[in-house]
Amino acid sequence: MITHFRFTAGSRNFWHYHPADQTLLVLDGEGFYQEEGGPKRTIRKGDVIVSPPNVKHWNGATPEQDLICITVTESALDGHAVQLRAVTDEEYGQ
């Protein structure tokens, strides 16, 4: 599945995971990516992030800039994504 996303400045998705590999390609802007238990990373145009199956993570735009990206998610019999909980303001602002 290929998906095009635009996160407006300050927005982010929920903690979630995918049953199969997902590749995120940053087309423009600046954002954040974090895997559970790891540091929050700043991502920018040209960055490529691969999320292995079943690894909990979140991503979104920085407070100042939109984030535009494409994701390519491998097929899995049990769905595209499993939504978990909201990313707290504290987690987002770390």
Region annotations inferred by a language model:
Residues 1-15:
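A short glycine-rich, His/Asp/Glu-containing loop-to-beta-strand
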Residues 2-6, 23, 48-50:
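Conserved hydrophobic/aromatic beta-strand scaffold that supports enzyme active sites
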Residues 6-8, 18-33, 72-74:
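Short, conserved beta-strand element in jelly-roll/cupin
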Residues 11, 19-20, 39, 55, ...:
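A generic "binding-loop/recognition-motif" signal
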Residues 14-15, 33-34, 51, 56-62:
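Short beta-strand His + acidic residue motifs that chelate non-heme Fe in jelly-roll/DSBH
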Residues 17, 25, 43-45, 61:
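Conserved strand-loop elements at the edges of beta-sheets that form or border functional pockets
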Residues 37-54:
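Short acidic-glycine-tyrosine-enriched beta hairpin
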Residues 58-94:
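Double-stranded beta-helix
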